[in-house]
């Protein structure tokens, strides 16, 4: 099957057929990596489907940028144990049947351990933290399908969901090999800790609410 003629490659091609919603289409693992190399948009691989993310609106993009900045205050470049990544770095989850997700952002344990599909095409396998910014088009997918797979990553300690429509941050923190604690914070005065560092909702939602 030819990636160039079968699957949308540009943002305009995707927008023309997706209507701003998630677009799913059957794809093989090999075809996924071919498409990932060419596509102008974020794309996941889940249950033998490509799941394409439509163009990010400004509010979503700003939230991802600002929260990544806050994470870099906790995990600076001088910290050789961790590295903050944006959505350009996919995460391979072997424990969930060869799933590949591109979270809005992640913190990856260093030195990195890569899944290498072929030279130059790699995915992270050792995330310490992942976060997703929830929107109308991705909420069901992020919480219903991605979350159970994220929980299967052995070294993952934190999963964060940041709501764009209202002040709400849900923090999943690993308690044991197969147990998680989740707490939702909805007050702008609320705060929570990541690695002993305090994050406040009023900083996360600065100039938003």
Language-model features: locations:
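Gly/Pro/Ser/Thr-rich low-complexity, intrinsically disordered segments predominantly at protein N-termini
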Residues: 1-209
